[in-house]
């Protein structure tokens, strides 16, 4: 057994020399135990810390529109910032594992605030089947997987269907974003979600239009 472990460690070290794992933000080689981003970049990650603020800006986006207990986002996405590479590589670079890693980081930090208390199920914002076939995965689902790894809360990817393949929301105004996502989601299994407290997970939050469209499917489910 010891010999097997030594061989695995040796192979891992050898492969790291040939193909070093690098921080997706700064490009420096990752140290042992680091994932996705190095410790320095993790410390400097522009966190919102909204989970520590009642009536935070994310929660205010949805006031008066859907029943909401709490909402947050992990870090600020700023144009020109190196940290944008995290999401760019997750969405367009085929690096789905970044989603799981960032989901774990986020969940670990939110645990102490009891943000996940009472949540029964996680629903990642679904992609249209054509877009998911092209990309090969749903990045929001991978973020949700990371959250599940820390919290143990199950994921539901079947109860809500994205029935329209919409244009990208980039460069659209608030009204255009709302029009673009109106009626794009369809509830498939209301009986499964009855009486459940649901966490909706998306990769990027700007105006909240997509999240709102998804959540609107749930407002008539009994007991939500």
Please identify what each model-predicted range represents:
Residues 1-202, 206-224:
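Glycine-rich phosphate/pyrophosphate-handling loop used in enzymes and phosphotransfer proteins
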